Amino acid sequence: MSYVFHRHCHATLPIIDKGEGVYLFDKHGKQYLDACGGAAVSNLGHSHQAVKKAMLEQLERVPFAHTGFFTSDSSERLAELICQHMPEQFNHVYLVSGGSEAVESALKMARQYFVESGKPEKKQFIARQQSYHGNTLGALAVGGNEWRREPFKPILHPSHHIAPCYAYRYQQSHESELGYSLRAANELEAKILELGADNVMAFVAEPIVGATAGAVPATQGYFKRIREICDQYDVLLILDEVMCGVGRSGSFLAFEQEEAEPDLVCMAKGLGAGYQPIGAVVANDRVYQAIADGSGFFQHGHTFMAHPVACAAAVATIQTIFQDDLLTAVNRQSALLRNELTSALAHLPYIGDIRGKGLFFGIELVADKESKAPLSKATLADKRIKQRAMENGLMCYPMGGTIDGVNGHHILLAPPFIIQSHHIDELVGKLSLTLKEVAETWK
């Protein structure tokens, strides 16, 4: 009997033993190619020496000091390092312990910004359907995945949702890419006007929608128009880069590839590359100064925020990304992975779309290519693909509910930045085999 309250109470999981590079090994010695980084976490693979060394050095100095009493060299260095790779108006980093905490902090920061600015009536959040922003109550409230929200709706703060920017599903045949971008973005303006601009404080979005929809990038011009709308109606733009940030998309942050900058940006997952739990909210000068020049106190906090060892791990992670030129590697291997996925899978009758940026890919499964009808829920495609992939020595991240939280299936891929060409061959080969084996059960 296990005394652990596992997320699936009746699951029988292999016991992890060790990690080396892009591979994980269980207690029986079985080797798994990590093609998803757990959940887009393990940017540097497993057992990276520079990160382990930085953590050990910090442990030998001091493992923990509460931020109500001390700051630390590692947290100061991390905040500085993050800001060095941000646009010039981002100069303050709030350090927490994970993605949900980062989003919760950003939501409260947005609220306090307007309270400090003399606009306490601004209290409504707008986000997007099929978004995912975390599992804590505030983050779940702005999230747009109905399956995750449903049991907890009675205790969620009311939030409002518009359609996602999801070209494969919603761009019409007669629309140009820009035309679709503007139509999708203008839903935000319509929702703001419906609620009253004086009541809306922030719009929350993932630049690349991650787990719930499968690496869905925005179309060209979408976020440029979103930024214009936010500016027009005095609404903060919060971008959630918990999954797509810190190099995953091929740039340090995904919004760098858009024509828009946020007011607050959240990051986590790859920030510590899985070596320690850590997250961050980066505030632009406008938001920070409103609080600093007002009460001077952000009314929020957690015991383990800015944890010295976690910060040391994150410093080493970011330094490694830039010193080893891993963003170049991400973009180079992205092209190879896209080509191999397309060659091996695109012709299959159940592959609807292969999409993504950097080393962040989604493969959407369908019952019919022309109509884009989803696979039946009865196929249990996500569960069966995950199980069979593990049997084949591959870790990928299949999910159900791609379209609306109930219907649709996709596979998310987010391999480590250190992945080599022969690993990509192995990844695509094992994934192709897995899909062909599982597809036999759909007939």
Q: Which ranges hold each PLM region?
A:
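Conserved N-terminal phosphate-binding loop of PLP-dependent enzymes in the Aspartate aminotransferase
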Residues: 1-443
